[in-house]
Amino acid sequence: MMNENEMVPIETVSWEQLQQYVYEVDGSWRDIYVLDATRADWKTWADFVNVNYRIEELEFTDGDAIRLDRIDFAAMEHLWDSHGQANMLWAGFLVGEIPIRCHFFRDDELENDLDPQKVTSYAVHQQLMDYLTRLSQALGKQVVLTWENDTPAARSPRWNGVWQPLLSVNGKQIEVQAYWRKPAAS
């Protein structure tokens, strides 16, 4: 018996369902969040990405895109400390075939963006799951995939439902919110 918005093991969901409902091409992006992030998490993330992925582009203040081969965590901290938030800093890197962009908006919210159009096959989906699983393990924290800008903090104060991500990764455990499945009749 399934409750509305119940998280289910990813193994119980077909690639076709993932493609249609999680990676639906609707003009919006999907966000990857590490909620309640700390600067220590950001440092771990930067080290993890620098070791495992190739940085495609890194943009600092003034809007000038520069090519660097690694994320400079000290520069991130400097921008957070001097500006309160690093609005003009982002890094682009590839996870397999998927371009990922990370924005350094706030030091307490680690966010990556991806275009769901780029998740073109089950094999490419697995590349993303590998990234999310390894990141969750490196941080020892839950990593979630959501609709664009969908975090608990972004919800209206009048909304009283339970917030659930599209997909949740906690270590090696991956769960999907199978919102398209009808709840069991009571």
Language-model segment annotations:
Residues 1-79:
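Long, contiguous N-terminal structural blocks used for assembly/anchoring
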Residues 1-9, 114-186:
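Acidic, proline/glycine-rich low-complexity IDRs
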Residues 14, 28, 41-44, 79, ...:
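Residues in intrinsically disordered, low-complexity segments of regulatory proteins
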Residues 17, 31, 44-47, 82, ...:
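Intrinsic disorder/low-complexity segments enriched in polar/charged and small flexible residues
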Residues 24-26, 106, 137:
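Solvent-exposed loop and beta-edge segments used for protein-protein assembly and interaction
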Residues 30, 108-110, 139-143:
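Generic beta-strand structural signal
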Residues 37-40, 96, 107, 117-119, ...:
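Generic structural motif
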Residues 55-108, 112-114:
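Short, intrinsically disordered low-complexity segments
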